[in-house]
UniProtKB/Swiss-Prot annotation:
It is found in: Cell inner membrane. PANTHER family: NA(+)_H(+) ANTIPORTER NHAB (PTHR43302:SF1), TRANSPORTER ARSB-RELATED (PTHR43302). GO terms for cellular component: plasma membrane. It is a multi-pass membrane protein. It catalyses: 2 Na(+)(in) + 3 H(+)(out) = 2 Na(+)(out) + 3 H(+)(in). It comes from the Bacteria. Signal peptide: none annotated. The lineage of its organism: Bacteria, Pseudomonadati, Pseudomonadota, Gammaproteobacteria, Vibrionales. One of its GO terms (molecular function) is sodium:proton antiporter activity. The chain crosses the membrane at residues 13-33, 34-54, 90-110, 113-133, 149-166, 205-225, 241-261, 306-326, 327-347, 351-371, 451-471, 479-499. Keywords: Antiport, Cell inner membrane, Cell membrane, Ion transport, Membrane, Sodium, Sodium transport, Transmembrane, Transmembrane helix, Transport. It comes from Vibrio vulnificus (strain YJ016). NCBIfam families: NhaB, PRK09547.1. This is Na(+)/H(+) antiporter NhaB. Belongs to the NhaB Na(+)/H(+) (TC 2.A.34) antiporter family.
Length: 529
């Protein structure tokens, strides 16, 4: 019997998502305007934030762009925020958007070099704990100079490469033949167990790398977008930023690496999976075949990609241009010198990041609601009202950490630094206290936010990437795997803020490493940013 038109509409709405999920989204869309108009806009705002987090948490059931987008469109339509405010948010975050559009595509054209390097690392280090440390440390080191999203894009690209090599061979095909690695139909039972273990192995490496980006990203002014904003407001340069953060970031970095080693050794929280022998064998064979089949043309490509990698690191570390523009230069150089000149070959590079870029635009419209409905105002006012300076530092760190878990850490950091700047200009706090608070804000937004994927853009990118469903990495799984790190990073960071920050900063002043700033810093950034 053919389906009625009404049923067809219902069936088409959100496609293959479960029925309960469709009902949930429709009920959100019905409830929100009622709460906004008849109860309280403030409550409606928080309700929207919770609903959006729900769509992120269910990313494996349905990509969050559609349900989150519907919620955002309705929020704008009923007046929770305006299209102008959304545009303002997008303009303020144009660097992040450019980065996603161009840099991630640029990394796609560096794939051969990345696979070459990481295959050597993966096969060269036998101990899983040492390998995890290597991934975590490498991600941290790179994130101190590059953007965390760029680093995660590199790691994702490598992991997809490793996954597809094994999946192809396990499905009974040759290494070089075409293959769809999203389908598990052709796998024998024996290889399914290996595949599950391999997925767990890749999951743990990706999470170590993800946390590594947070460990490294907090230390320097170029590590995360909000660091740049905070450094700009405080008039700190690269060296001063590094030194001022050190009392908190160094202990956190050491404890983060110790946590990485511990969870692997103890095999807890979903860590500890080893690389199955069959998979290692396939990867070794793949490496041998690649070496044999490598022509001079391939070697030339690797050299070119190596040179471009040097340009990438130098360009980003010295901030020679906006990150996205450096990404665009990578696309142009890599394609021109490796002979990729057809339009359809270029198109594939953009497939990975554009859905996420669209999702991020929706995310910024939710941020616009947070600004227009002043959802964070009660928290900010309460913290600024605390009299005792030491307590105020700790409170700032905690409040920042909690808000960063729900919202984008760029947004939270920006809102806080603006409020503190206003307090400085109005003479409520001294310049030295402002500098200490800036450290508390930076570490508060960067460290505890590893708790959930919405806190760290790099985690959100990983969760919504094409790789996440392949290795069965869900929102819940990420939260659980991040838990030991969340606890250690948040507590050690708090310890640093409470016990180390003031005495160490005084010592830095006395040693002449940093100088006292006089008067207020740059004027507060306009609007929400």
């Amino acid at each position: 019997m053919p389906m009625s038109l009404g049923n067809a509409f219902i069936k088409n709405f959100l496609g293959k998502a479960p029925d309960w999920y469709k009902v949930a989204i429709i009920s959100f869309l019905i409830i929100n305007p009622i709460v906004f108009f008849f109860v309280d806009p403030f409550v409606a705002g928080w309700l929207l934030v919770v609903e959006f987090i729900f769509t992120l948490a269910m990313a494996l059931k349905c990509y969050p762009l559609q349900p989150g987008g519907l919620l955002a469109i309705e929020a704008i339509a009923i007046g929770m925020t305006s299209p102008e405010q959304v545009k303002h948010e997008l303009v303020a975050n144009i660097e992040v958007l450019l980065l996603l559009v161009f840099m991630v595509a640029g990394i796609y054209f560096m794939k051969q070099l990345l696979l070459f390097i990481f295959t050597k690392i993966l096969l060269g280090i036998r101990s899983k704990a040492i390998l995890s440390l290597a991934f975590c440390f490498a991600a941290a080191f790179l994130s101190a100079f590059l953007d965390a999203l760029t680093v995660i894009a590199v790691v994702i690209s490598v992991a997809v490469g490793f996954y597809s090599i094994y999946h192809k061979v396990a499905s009974g095909k040759g290494v070089s033949s075409d293959h769809d690695h999203t389908q598990d139909d052709h796998l024998a039972e024996l290889t399914r167990d290996d595949l599950e273990n391999y997925r767990a192995f890749l999951r743990s490496l990706l999470m170590h790398a993800g946390v590594g980006t947070a460990l490294g990203g907090v230390t320097t002014m170029v590590g995360e977008p909000q660091n740049l904003i905070i450094a700009d407001q405080a008039s700190w340069l690269f060296g001063e930023f590094l030194i001022r953060m050190a009392p908190v970031t160094l202990p956190v970095f050491v404890c983060g690496l110790l946590t990485c080693f511990a969870v692997e050794k103890l095999k807890v929280f979903g860590y500890g999976a080893e690389l199955p022998d069959n998979v290692r064998h396939i990867l070794v064979e793949f490496d041998k075949e690649e070496r044999k089949a490598r022509t001079n043309q391939d070697v030339a490509k690797l050299w070119i990609q190596g040179l471009i990698a040097v340009w990438l690191i130098v360009g980003l570390a010295l901030h020679l241009a906006a990150v996205g523009l450096i990404g665009l230069s990578v696309i142009i150089l890599a394609t021109a010198f490796t002979g990729v000149i057809e339009e359809h070959s270029l198109g594939k590079a953009f497939e990975e990041a554009l859905p996420f870029t669209a999702l991020l635009a929706v995310f910024f419209s939710i941020v616009a609601v947070i600004i227009d409905q002043e959802l964070f105002k009660p928290v900010i006012d309460a913290v600024l009202a605390v009299e005792d300076k030491g307590t105020q530092l700790a409170m700032f760190y905690v409040a920042n950490g909690l808000l960063s878990m729900v919202s984008d850490n760029v947004f939270v950091g920006t809102v806080y630094i603006n409020e503190v700047k206003t307090a400085l200009v109005e003479g409520i706090i001294t310049r030295d206290q402002f500098d200490l608070l800036a450290v508390a804000i930076n570490t508060g937004t960067n460290l505890p936010s590893v708790a959930t994927p919405n806190g760290q853009a790099a985690f959100l990118f990983l969760l919504t990437s094409a790789l996440a469903p392949l290795i069965r990495l869900s929102y819940g799984k990420m939260v659980i795997m991040a838990l030991p790190y969340t606890i250690v990073l948040a507590l050690v960071g708090l310890f640093g803020i409470v016990f180390l920050l003031e005495p160490m900063t005084t010592w830095f002043y006395d040693a002449g490493w940093i100088a006292h700033h006089v008067g207020e810093a740059t004027h507060a950034v306009s609007g929400g940013h």
